[in-house]
Amino acid sequence: EILNTEELGGELIRFLVQSYPGVLQEKYDVSESQDIYACLEEIAKNRHCLVRGSELDMEKAARLLLDDFRNGRIGRITLEFPQDYEETDGE
């Protein structure tokens, strides 16, 4: 696998909690105050991402989160902000 989907999903969670507080709570009914892996676990539980009975499928939960992000189902989210590109005097 070229991309670690769970790691990428975790980074997306970290970004959303920091830059768009409340969006994960609203969309997935998860607590944003917990660590990233626990948040992904909660998404897996709430979306019934299971493997062999009751084992959580974290890969599937991460793919679901990433697909929702890519397709705009989480909302209008931008990864770049104007202040990231503001020039300082003398440049």
Language model features by range: what are they?
Residues 1-91:
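Helix-rich effector regions associated with P-loop NTPase G domains
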